[in-house]
Amino acid sequence: MEQKRRPFQGVLNILSFNRHFYVFGLGALVILFASRYLIKWPDPIFWIVITAFLYGLIAPLLVSAYVYDFSGYYSLNWLTPLVTDPQKVQTIVNINAGFDETSFIIKSKFPRSDLQAFDFYNAKQHTEPAIKRARKVSLVYPNTRQVASGSLPLTDGTVDLVCLLSAAHEIRSHQEKIAFLKECHRSCAPGGKVIMVEHLRDFSNFLAFSVGFTHFFSRSTWKDAFQRAGFSTFQETKFTPFMSIFECQP
């Protein structure tokens, strides 16, 4: 059963999953203030450094609150113009990296569809501390299957909609991305599509996450991966300045 999201759940998740970053940042601030007793910092330089640290800590939380708590992302209403005939969507696969906040919502929007949830997380290959923590608190959709990113247990040409919602960037290797997307391509039915939502490694996300934007990948990287996987279309729609929705068809 779908659970109602708590107020500020998105930003609280960011704090929880990335707490190592915030512990380090706060520790660095304490050291900087303490250093004033040992080093004669010029005031302008000191406050520029402090402001930069505070910006790096606060900006990601503000943007995350906007995107995940106030933008309507989890309503999935943005799917409506991408799926013009929901009655034809019989089979859906929602693929995540072990943190699944969307399968129950997708099922509520497509109640007559056969929805399968796959988890491609591999502890040896996907080593980010945040995703390890996220997996521990994720609500698991019934019968979620653990899968290998390069070998999805799907029959050729049988899936109407593949959803990759804020998960595919956890595949760090470009070759693994291509192999994974080839599997998505293979499984798509005639008229089927892949819908992927991602932050990008672009200027907007640099302003939001500073060096943390390197956790994401550029539009050109994703375009190359989809094209090399055999997809013929790669259409982008912006959802807030910080997220992109990609609609890709074989």
Model regions: which residues?
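A short glycine-rich, Lys/Arg-flanked "PGG" loop and its adjoining helix->strand segment in the class I
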Residues: 177-193
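Class I SAM-dependent methyltransferase Rossmann-like catalytic core
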Residues: 2, 8-27, 33-86
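Class I SAM-dependent methyltransferase SAM/SAH-binding core
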Residues: 91-94, 98-151
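C-terminal alpha-helical "lid/dimerization" subdomain adjacent to the S-adenosyl-L-methionine
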Residues: 193-247
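A short acidic, Gly/Pro-enriched loop at the edge of an enzyme's catalytic core
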Residues: 149-162
